[in-house]
Amino acid sequence: TKFYHALTKQRRVRNKIVGLHDDLGNWITEENGIEKVAVDYFDGLFSTTNPTDFDNFLDEIVPSISPQMNHILLRTATEEEVRQALFMMHPEKAPGPDGMTALFFQHSWHIIKKDLVEMVNNFLVTCNLDPRLNITNICMIPKVERPTRMMELRPISLCNVGYKIISKVLCQRLKICLPRLISETQSAFVAGRLISDNILIAQEMFHGLRTNKSCQNKFMAIKTDMSKAYDRIEWSFIEALLNKMGFDPRWITLMVECISSVQYRVLLNGQPRGLIIPQRGLRQGDTLSPYLFIMCTEALIVNIKKRRG
């Protein structure tokens, strides 16, 4: 036991943020100053560019969601559906601002199940989240030893369990629609597809480029890095995309409410500091984010195919 306590203490000391460089390169060590550097960084990252015209970019998206699918997406949540969403969670993952892990909710299910089902269905009917549910802590994981800049820290969102339950219920429903929406060029997060398939395809393509002389003169491969891809997605684009795909307006409202009603606090050395009201972006740590992201990526893929053709 002493060994693990010492290891935890050592890691806490090693990961402690004693100072950060601000945008001008100044070294800030005062606690309130470090908070300002972090808050200013995320304020800038989550500030919208106010894009408006998506018609041309979404022109090739074909409505794929039938009225029957929309009915399934918006139906009343059952007790079993909520129970599955809760018990899918790791019981001891890092807690959100409420300070409670999923373990407490799982052990207390027989007592609180009625309240949890009512909470989920209240959201499905009103499309309004209790603001307290969507307060989120940003935990910053060092990418390097002794980080000195915000770019050297990886933000992970720690959500409240109540929000996670709602999010997982919505995700389990959305999963049913994904095979109709997502082309086979994307293999992540879609049931029946493996991301390893695309790795094998990429290896075969590069092998062909290296060994086939005719390919070397006519083809090329481009690797793109989507820097801060989740953080820069505009909410207005997601709304326009979902509408184009044929989702019911009420489902779109549910999605937008989940991603836009969030308020962030930054965990600095274990303490929540500052307040960030984002204008765009998807949370890394929210169950919905990967599914919304691959749907946005699908719009990019459709446009690449359009230009190629």
Can you say where each PLM-predicted feature lies in the sequence?
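Conserved pre-motif C helix in the palm subdomain of viral-like polymerases
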Residues: 151-182, 200, 206, 279-309
